[in-house]
């Protein structure tokens, strides 16, 4: 084998390895996500909701990898979401005193927010509101 062939083989194998790693990072959260709550479970938990809001995909901060579409309800015991989220690792749910549309808004307001909990599913979720959160 010539040096040129060896270099091409090494380069193509490295490209395939990097591509496999990137695809694995994207797919792993989808494969390891727990089952999402059913629509009836979400409806039961959201029956005492005090507030309702929506996630829209057309916000300034949304892109192919960061979006959500659906209805959020906020109650004393649960915050529920019926809809879909972009797959991704380590989603956290925060309550903010102001509207947040972009990552810059989030970073600016993060110190004033209350972290409620982790979101582990990409379709429908229910998160317990911790004691002491009003």
Language model segments and positions:
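Hydrophobic membrane-insertion alpha-helices, especially the h-region
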Residues: 7-26
């Amino acid at each position: 084998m010539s040096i040129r062939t060896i270099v091409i083989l090494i380069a193509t194998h490295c490209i395939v390895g990097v591509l496999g790693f990137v695809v694995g990072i994207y797919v792993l959260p989808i494969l390891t996500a727990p089952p999402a709550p059913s629509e009836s479970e979400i409806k039961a938990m959201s029956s005492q909701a005090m507030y309702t809001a929506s996630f829209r995909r057309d916000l300034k901060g949304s892109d192919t990898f960061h979006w959500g579409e659906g209805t959020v309800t906020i109650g004393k015991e649960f915050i529920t979401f019926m809809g879909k989220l972009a797959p991704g690792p380590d989603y956290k749910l925060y309550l903010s005193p102001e509207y947040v549309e972009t990552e810059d808004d989030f970073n600016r307001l993060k110190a004033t927010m209350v972290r409620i909990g982790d979101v582990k599913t990409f379709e429908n979720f229910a998160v317990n509101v911790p004691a002491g959160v009003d």
